[in-house]
């Protein structure tokens, strides 16, 4: 799921978004038929017109808040904070608020190290490692552990 606002519809923001769309096999213009064409191959959803209501629904209605900002570009991470307040564990690159709040494996998960410089390939590898080795086993095999993680997420946001 790709959610966000292209800041002031800047050319740079549009360029990056268009590159993402091209990367997933669609053309630069997001159209319904384009999404349908790639849906069988790559499950992608783009939520347009992201606003406070949409943010509220997402931060209170997901099982894990996966956040992978480019270090050090995360201003604060308020959506992750809101998710934690709703008992949603964060799984995030250590940027914004998360380096101060994260206790890996207790209230969420860290992706990589805070000291790391930008390395998209390494970050992608670390995302999959954390999801496969930490997040999914807890979710699938330890309901009590998951509940404790949710409670610790709420406590971290207090």
Residue ranges and their predicted role:
Residues 2-54:
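Nucleotide-activated donor-binding/catalytic signature segment of Leloir-type glycosyltransferases, i.e.
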Residues 57-157:
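Catalytic binding pocket for nucleotide-activated donors in carbohydrate/polymer assembly enzymes
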Residues 5, 49, 97, 157-158:
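Residue-level preference for alpha-helix termini and adjacent loops
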Residues 27, 35, 141-142, 158:
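Polar helix-capping/helix-linker motif
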Residues 1-2, 90:
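Short, charged N-terminal helix-start/capping segments
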């Amino acid at each position: 799921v790709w959610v966000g606002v292209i800041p002031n519809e800047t050319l740079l923001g549009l360029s990056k978004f268009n590159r993402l769309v091209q990367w997933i096999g669609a053309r630069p213009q997001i159209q319904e038929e384009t999404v349908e064409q790639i849906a069988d191959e790559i499950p992608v959803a783009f939520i347009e017109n992201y606003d406070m209501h949409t943010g509220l629904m997402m931060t209170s209605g997901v099982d894990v808040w996966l956040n992978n900002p480019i270090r050090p570009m995360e201003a604060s991470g308020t959506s992750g904070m809101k998710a934690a307040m709703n008992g949603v564990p964060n799984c995030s690159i250590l940027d914004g608020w998360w380096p101060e709040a994260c206790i890996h494996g207790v209230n969420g998960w860290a992706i990589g190290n805070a000291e790391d410089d930008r390395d998209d390939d390494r970050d992608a590898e670390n995302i999959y490692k954390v999801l496969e080795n930490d997040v999914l086993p807890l979710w699938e095999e330890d309901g009590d552990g998951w509940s404790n993680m949710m409670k610790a997420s709420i406590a971290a946001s207090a």
